[in-house]
A protein has these predicted regions:
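Non-catalytic cell-wall polysaccharide-engagement segments
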Residues: 1-22, 29, 33-34, 53-174
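Acidic helix-start/capping segments at beta-turn-to-alpha-helix junctions
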Residues: 28-31, 38-54
């Protein structure tokens, strides 16, 4: 698990257009700040038939290293699955469109950068749909690609309910 101060540092450096606290809330909801997190996405209610919430299924065991995460993700993709991975649970469907390889996108900074790009795109769309408060709609779009589904499945309230305590930096007096 990545500690919150390090995540905030990465978010500020890698996706400066989005508030680091917003990205931290998303990462806490998506991966519990685990950089090697991996989930399998299933279409059309398949996950629910398997007893999993939403459109994804959690793996019984999570990868313990980047190498293991890459091996598992590649194997699942080769088997025809779509996976979400990393701190921000980036969908493998976005990689080619955004010009990244799986290896690149599993790097924490790149994973956060991709999330920042995607959330910026979703915010631009959400501003036309909800000009007074676009973030909740953008979060729903980030989660599901749908402006309502992220509300219905609890994702938006889950992200907005995440607590990210302010980080105080201690400076030793010289």
């Amino acid at each position: 698990m990545m500690d919150l101060p390090l995540f905030i540092e990465h978010a500020q450096a890698c996706a400066p257009a989005i508030e680091a606290v917003t990205l931290a809330k998303i990462a806490k909801q998506e991966s519990a700040l685990r950089p090697w997190a991996l989930s399998v996405n299933y279409p059309n209610g398949t996950a629910r038939k398997l007893g999993e919430p939403g459109g994804y299924a959690r793996l019984q065991k999570q990868p313990s290293s980047k190498d293991q995460a890459l091996r598992w993700a590649k194997r699942l993709i080769e088997q025809g699955h779509t996976v979400s991975f990393g701190l921000m649970q980036i969908s493998s469907q976005n990689l080619a469109r955004l010009g990244y390889t799986l290896e690149q996108a599993y790097e924490p900074c790149t994973n956060i950068k991709i999330a920042g790009t995607l959330l910026s795109q979703k915010l631009a769309s959400a501003k036309t749909l909800a000009p007074d408060n676009p973030l909740p709609v953008a979060l729903s779009l980030y989660n599901s690609g749908d402006m309502r589904m992220g509300f219905a499945n609890g994702y938006v309230s889950g992200v907005l309910g995440q607590v990210v305590k302010p980080i105080s930096l201690r400076v030793n007096a010289a």
